[in-house]
Amino acid sequence: MAKQNIFDNEVFFEGYKDLRNREKNANNLFEIPALFSLLPELKGLRILDLGCGFGEHCKDYIRMGAEKVVGIDISEKMLEVAKAENSDPKITYINLAMEDLNVIDEEFDLVISSLALHYIEDFDGVLKNINNLLAKDGYFIFSQESPLSTCFSGGERWTRDENGNKLHLNLTNYGREKEASSEWFVEGVKRYHRMFSTIVNSLVDAGFSVERMVEPLPNEEILAKYPDYEDLFHKPDFLLVKAKKNK
């Protein structure tokens, strides 16, 4: 199966970096707080960060007491930034695709992945490798784009009133699990759509029990500052899952 490395495209990389630096950033407002709310006590834990990107979270995990962190990413450009800006003696960065986790010969107490799995074709294979890397009773915590977003395959995403206000989401082809190419900074960015049931069943089949799922929504403080995020009550942007290894 093909491994996607869109982040080493110079145009994509610069566009993505600019997006993550903006104050009005859905990742910082919703996804990251939700992800951190699912974390257990990190003191003394061995952590694997899949798709670690710039490495900010790897550094956060060390500050929170982790014994060691291994961050992997397929993007050399991302890891250059991680090593320059978020290095630590307890952090190891490895240039590796998630599909190749089987080459890692270590054991971890916690595996974390932030917004990477919807770029992966072999979801089931990656989950099995994660389970193999986890210690007994270890946890896998991840975020991804909502399946209500990954099912989108063109046309008008929203029905709007005469003033352009969003009335409701136009949901189509939710049950058609597929690869979809879209334009995001550059053309040809591939995402893989899976239904909620597929995500849960794949986790169970890989030896996990699902303990919690979160679809973060804006609070009143965020809405007062960024009223456009009202549309998240129609369609949350993110899905987060906390799963425990049970076999």
Identify what each model region corresponds to.
Residues 1-42, 56-60, 78-81, 140-177:
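Conserved class I S-adenosyl-L-methionine
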Residues 48-50, 54-101:
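Class I SAM-dependent methyltransferase SAM/SAH-binding core
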Residues 102-110:
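A short acidic, Gly/Pro-enriched loop at the edge of an enzyme's catalytic core
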Residues 110-123:
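A short SAM/SAH-binding and catalytic strip from SAM-dependent methyltransferases
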Residues 124-139:
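A short glycine-rich, Lys/Arg-flanked "PGG" loop and its adjoining helix->strand segment in the class I
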Residues 144, 148-153, 157, 183-197:
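Acceptor-substrate binding/catalytic loop of class I
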Residues 179, 190-214:
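Short alpha-helix
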